[in-house]
């Protein structure tokens, strides 16, 4: 199979956009050629992206697409011909347009074939569509690709001939090779060839790509360029790990991607900074190295920051001392700034900063951060009391939770909000759980993030998310479609995770009511607790499905809208165990039938009157329910939901016999009402743990 290589050589591309640009460039070219029939079955594409080039290698490329036999509907016969069988004006006009579109001179009416189209007899034209040749197809695909790239910001630059060109960065060369043959194509004022340039500093002169399959190897050997984005990234990772030795590299993927987009021939060098800077919280030092300098910090086996770091350079040299010293010199003022912020912030206790939160607007309809802190104290205090946590500690933590927003360090690095609050609270002599709550109350920050580790941190985190959810929703900013500017979906998930995973003996209604009460007197906030409750249950469904439970299992439990969620996993596991029983399907179907019967009746269902049980089957069912009921209730009280549901299996025979031999809606109203009462008792028993009718197919 033939291989097509396309490379666009440019000035340095935006680092944060490189991965996306590379993927889009390769995939768009592939899709464009495929749409024209220029790719064989099983064709594959490999993308390349470096700071100075976008490229794609496509295997299975045809020189020309195969011809296609096409059949196109023209017009219904009754419109195409008049009463005398002569062509009408609509037919003449249609044939002229069709001929023009397919490149034919004319199309004679007598050449058309007649056939039914499903509604009426119509005229059809058969013709052969010539397949596109590669040069034309590539030109179309390349132009479409360039026009459709996800470019963050377009530049306007001039070609040597004075023409203005718009692209993400100035483009200098274009390669288009089918195996070893140059395919003529042009874009951005460039014409295709087989010549490129290598590394800006480590390679001199032009490089000829001899064959499309030799692109990556030629660039690597002659140009000092690792063209593959993923290959280069893994090379950086390997070199970092090698240089770290026994230490651990702090290596977030986002930083690795950004550095990867800055180098074509990565080389890792170790550097140092003075130990005195280690007195500053390591989160500050790590963040300043990552954000400002794109350096990789190192920690020891205990997770403590080392006074050395790694840089990824685009220059390979046998005498790297100048590079190392230059980077050490550059990082020193950054670390000194962090130390200054830390020392200056410590001079003012967090508690003294709280009144200044009155100058920080949270939302113009809700008030300032100081007013918000007051609400957090009220909510956290109630929750702490309900859970048996330290109310005073919860209130103190809520008071201090937002104070670090006014510190110099958080002003410089907003990502450190909460983290710095913990350091400053410890310095001020606050209780350890109060200090930890300053950072823990933001948790979980994202899906899969750790939950707060302390009871104080948990209640303040719950209060923070409840206050945001109820307050922002209450001013009419509920999530809509893709818009969720206040991350209410994330806050809702955090609330649910804490209720379930901690677990917490709190009901959904009581925590929402506690939050709503804190907004009393604020006219702009109109909490819609019913809508928020629906929202929480919808998020709960998604959370449980992500945990691996089926839709039926989830609906069996969530459809009952349980208030407390601390036992919801046990209920789900019980439902799963019940569903595996041989009696489950029949009982689920019966429960569904009972539910439908009870929904349709408009009478008040009372208690069962044994003397009105006339049929053997209804007496047997009443006895079976009476026998099972204490066992189900005892198991439920113990939290043994699996046993509670499995006990229902003994009811199957009695339930089947009842529906086979008893007319529920009897003419005698006394008998009817008594049988409905019996079904009501059975329904209550069967749905004590979950609505098992949701398991019915």
Curated annotation (Swiss-Prot):
Gene Ontology terms describing biological process: arginyl-tRNA aminoacylation; glycyl-tRNA aminoacylation
Subcellular location: Cytoplasm
Gene Ontology molecular-function annotations: arginine-tRNA ligase activity; ATP binding; glycine-tRNA ligase activity
UniProt cross-references to Pfam families, sorted A to Z: DALR_1 (PF05746), tRNA_synt_2f (PF02092)
Cellular component GO terms, alphabetical: cytosol
Cystine pairs: none
Superkingdom, natural source: Bacteria
Keyword Cytoplasm: yes
Presence of keyword Glycoprotein: no
Keyword list, A-Z: Aminoacyl-tRNA synthetase, ATP-binding, Cytoplasm, Ligase, Nucleotide-binding, Protein biosynthesis
InterPro entries linked to this entry: DALR_anticod-bd, Gly-tRNA-synth_bsu, Gly-tRNA-synth_heterodimer
Record's catalysed reaction(s): tRNA(Gly) + glycine + ATP = glycyl-tRNA(Gly) + AMP + diphosphate
EC number from the UniProt entry: 6.1.1.14
Quaternary structure and partners: Tetramer of two alpha and two beta subunits.
Family under the similarity heading: Belongs to the class-II aminoacyl-tRNA synthetase family.
The name this protein goes by in its record: Glycine--tRNA ligase beta subunit
Natural source organism: Ralstonia nicotianae (strain ATCC BAA-1114 / GMI1000)
Gene name linked to the record: glyS
């Amino acid at each position: 199979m033939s291989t097509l290589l396309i490379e666009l050589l440019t000035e340095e591309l935006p680092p944060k956009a490189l991965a996306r640009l590379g993927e889009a460039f390769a995939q768009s070219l592939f899709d464009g050629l495929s749409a024209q029939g220029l790719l064989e079955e099983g064709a594959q594409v490999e993308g390349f992206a470096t700071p100075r080039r976008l490229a794609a290698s496509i295997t299975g490329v045809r020189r020309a697409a195969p011809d296609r036999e096409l059949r196109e509907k023209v017009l219904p016969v009754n419109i195409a011909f008049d009463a005398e069988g002569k062509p009408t004006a609509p037919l003449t006009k249609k044939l002229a347009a069709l001929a023009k579109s397919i490149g034919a001179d004319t199309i004679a009416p007598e050449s058309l074939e007649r056939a039914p189209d499903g509604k009426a007899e119509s005229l059809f034209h058969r013709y052969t569509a010539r397949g596109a040749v590669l040069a034309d197809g590539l030109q179309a695909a390349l132009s479409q690709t360039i026009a459709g790239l996800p470019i963050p910001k377009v530049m306007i630059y001039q070609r040597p001939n004075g023409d203005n060109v718009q692209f993400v960065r100035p483009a200098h060369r274009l390669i288009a090779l089918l195996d070893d043959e140059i395919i003529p194509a042009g874009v951005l004022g460039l014409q295709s060839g087989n010549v490129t340039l290598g590394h800006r500093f480590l390679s001199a002169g032009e490089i000829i790509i001899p064959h499309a399959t030799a692109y990556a190897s030629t660039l690597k050997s002659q140009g000092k360029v690792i063209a593959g984005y993923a290959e280069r990234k893994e090379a950086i990772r390997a070199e970092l790990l090698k240089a770290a030795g026994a230490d651990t590299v702090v290596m977030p993927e986002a930083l690795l991607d950004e550095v990867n987009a800055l180098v074509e021939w990565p080389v890792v060098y170790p550097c140092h900074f003075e130990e005195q800077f280690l007195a500053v919280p390591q989160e500050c030092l790590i963040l300043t190295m990552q954000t400002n300098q794109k350096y990789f910090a190192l920690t020891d086996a205990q997770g403590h920051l080392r006074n050395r770091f790694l840089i990824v350079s685009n220059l390979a040299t046998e005498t790297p001392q100048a590079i190392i010293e230059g980077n050490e010199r550059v990082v020193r003022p950054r670390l000194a700034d962090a130390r200054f912020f830390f020392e200056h912030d410590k001079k003012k206790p967090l508690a003294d900063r709280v009144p200044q939160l009155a100058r920080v607007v949270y939302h113009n309809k809700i008030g300032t951060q100081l007013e918000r802190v007051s609400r957090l104290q009220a909510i956290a205090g109630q929750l702490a009391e309900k859970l048996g946590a330290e109310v005073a500690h919860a209130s103190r933590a809520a008071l201090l939770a937002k104070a670090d927003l006014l510190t110099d360090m958080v002003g410089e690095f907003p990502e450190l909000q909460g983290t710095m609050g913990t350091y400053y609270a410890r310095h001020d002599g606050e209780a350890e759980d109060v200090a930890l709550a300053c950072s823990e109350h933001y948790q979980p920050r994202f899906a899969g993030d750790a939950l707060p580790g302390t009871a104080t941190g948990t209640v303040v985190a719950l209060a923070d998310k409840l206050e945001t959810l109820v307050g922002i929703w209450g001013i009419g900013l509920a999530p809509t479609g893709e818009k969720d500017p206040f991350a209410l979906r994330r806050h809702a998930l955090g609330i649910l995770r804490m209720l379930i995973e901690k677990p917490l003996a709190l009901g959904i209604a009581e925590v929402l009511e506690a939050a709503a009460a804190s907004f009393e007197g604020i006219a702009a906030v109109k909490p819609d607790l019913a809508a928020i409750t629906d929202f929480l249950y919808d998020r709960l469904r998604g959370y449980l499905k992500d945990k691996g439970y089926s839709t039926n299992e989830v609906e069996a439990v969530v459809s009952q809208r349980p208030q407390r969620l601390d036992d919801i996993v046990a209920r789900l596991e019980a439902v799963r165990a019940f569903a595996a029983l041989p009696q489950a399907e029949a009982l689920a179907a019966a429960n569904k039938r009972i539910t439908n019967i009870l929904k349709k009746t408009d009478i008040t269902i009372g208690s069962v009157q044994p003397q009105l049980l006339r049929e053997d089957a209804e007496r047997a069912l009443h006895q079976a329910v009476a026998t099972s009921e204490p066992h189900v209730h005892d198991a439920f009280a113990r939290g043994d939901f699996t046993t509670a549901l499995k006990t229902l299996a003994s009811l199957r025979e009695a339930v089947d016999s009842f529906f086979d031999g008893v007319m529920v809606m009897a003419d005698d109203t006394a008998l009817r009402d008594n049988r409905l009462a019996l079904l009501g008792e059975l329904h209550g028993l069967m749905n004590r743990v979950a609505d098992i009718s949701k398991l019915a197919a």
